Amino acid sequence: MGRLDGKVIVLTAAAQGIGRAAALAFAKEGAKVIATDINDSKLQELDKYPGIHTRVLDVTKKKQIDQFANDIERLDVLFNVAGFVHHGTILDCEETDWDFSMNLNVRSMYLMIKAFLPKMMAQKSGNIINMSSVASSIKGVVNRCVYSTTKAAVIGLTKSVAADFIQQGIRCNCVCPGTVDTPSLQERIQARPNPEEALSDFLKRQKTGRFATAEEVALLCVYLASDESAYITGNPVIIDGGWSL
């Protein structure tokens, strides 16, 4: 018996990084996973794994999300992962950067939750997990102005949904990682003028001396998706190797 046997789980940004690791971990524990991403070619790599079904989805497009929600008969867990990390202070953040980050990191979760929550309410049960970050209202981080702002908003959204719908059988939590070794992180390091120095800077702030792995974060997500965490709601759950201490 898997820890997620019989559960239907929808997640976004499943083609790589934490989303991919979570999709695989959910399926391994017996869930029926509907993995979505905008990147069709990378997403298709998940089709070979038992228990995982894929669907191309742009989480910034309301029409696509509403159609997707209409196609899903039942849903136990919604895991909102999609997001973007902008590098810079407020002076480096143009209005286009601000709008893009808000749209992908916050509005997409609003759209997904609003589309799928009525289905959960009709079932009188549901579990929503949002991807936030330690770089948020939890910790001020250099050069993460708009990113931290969006992730603080995710914590606020999470607490609001949890408070509003707890009596309807709905739980809502968010995962707050520190620095995780993902393709996104490696791309950001390589984009810096001195990648070697950037890597060193990232590692220096890790009290454990290493990054988290996507698989470690995925194991926390399995716990939050399972009935083992049934008494947990409205919480930003930190997994950061002590970075926020």
Swiss-Prot record:
Residue numbers binding NAD(+): Q16, G17, I18, D37, D58, K151, V180, D181, T182, P183, S184
Keyword Oxidoreductase set for record: yes
EC number: 1.1.1.-, 1.1.1.30, 1.1.1.104
One Pfam family here: adh_short_C2
Binding site residues for substrate: R144, R188, R205
TM stretches of this protein: none
Annotated InterPro entries: NAD(P)-bd_dom_sf (IPR036291), Sc_DH/Rdtase_CS (IPR020904), SDR_fam (IPR002347), SDR_superfamily_enzyme (IPR051122)
Cellular component annotations (GO), alphabetically ordered: cytoplasm
Protein name per the record: Dehydrogenase/reductase SDR family member 6
Originating species: Bos taurus
Lineage: Eukaryota, Metazoa, Chordata, Craniata, Vertebrata
Gene: BDH2
